[in-house]
């Protein structure tokens, strides 16, 4: 289990991610949810309380749950039932997924509504996800326990860190908040560019497979990863006097 200082930092990082995603307009009403494992086994995790807008979430609001303790749903501040089903399952079944972010962002969700919901490598951002995205085309309703188990099985391969949840939204996983948030933002932008290119009705210029794979590997090895982004978000929020760390 993380020490007190480490846990405080984890809370602040996750709260900052909620605030930033809200600023980007990627959340939906008071739905959607993020989680972050805070112990070595990945079974204890932070998650947002149910029915609270991302723009209002503070570090102290985040719930500390045990993936093996379903009694958490009896708490007065229990998370959304689908949040518990999805994230509880992820932290029980997928120890490599330390952080998980689920949103119904417009562009990733629109991609998942296409008959062919695969993102082709039409630009540098899209190429970063080449062969690294799982796709679910068997939407079966709200993500309660059975649906959550089925969906999470699609992320069993550690190389697949994005799941396009067909007719639903997107789930992004990673090593921590910085890594996962960075991936979520880039994937949403890649989807936006692809959909805009499709909207022209003109032929697409798709990168060769070899170039896409090379780009993806280069991006994975790029120095810093998402850390500079998260550090910048903290600085911006602090400069603005945000209460996200409370």
Feature locations, PLM:
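Glycine-rich flexible loops
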Residues: 1-246
């Amino acid at each position: 289990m993380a020490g007190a200082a480490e846990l405080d930092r984890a809370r602040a990082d996750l709260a900052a991610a909620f605030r930033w995603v809200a600023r980007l307009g990627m959340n939906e009403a008071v739905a959607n949810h993020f989680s972050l494992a805070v112990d070595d086994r990945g079974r204890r995790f932070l998650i947002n309380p149910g029915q609270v807008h991302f723009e209002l979430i503070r570090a102290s609001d985040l719930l500390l749950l045990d993936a093996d303790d379903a009694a958490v749903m009896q708490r007065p501040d229990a998370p959304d039932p689908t949040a518990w089903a999805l994230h509880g399952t992820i932290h029980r079944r997928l120890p490599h997924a330390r952080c998980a972010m689920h949103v119904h962002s417009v562009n990733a969700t629109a991609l998942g509504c296409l008959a062919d919901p695969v993102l082709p490598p039409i630009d540098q951002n899209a190429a970063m996800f080449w062969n690294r995205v799982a796709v679910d085309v068997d939407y079966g309703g709200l993500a309660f326990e059975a649906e959550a188990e089925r969906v999470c099985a699609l992320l069993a391969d550690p190389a697949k860190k994005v799941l396009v949840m067909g007719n639903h939204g997107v789930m992004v996983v990673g090593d921590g908040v910085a890594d996962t948030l960075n991936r979520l933002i880039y994937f949403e932008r890649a989807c936006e560019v692809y959909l805009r290119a499709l909207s022209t009705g003109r032929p697409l210029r798709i990168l060769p497979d070899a170039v896409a794979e090379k780009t993806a590997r280069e991006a994975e090895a790029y120095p810093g990863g998402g850390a500079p982004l998260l550090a910048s978000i903290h600085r911006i929020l602090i400069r603005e006097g945000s209460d996200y760390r409370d």
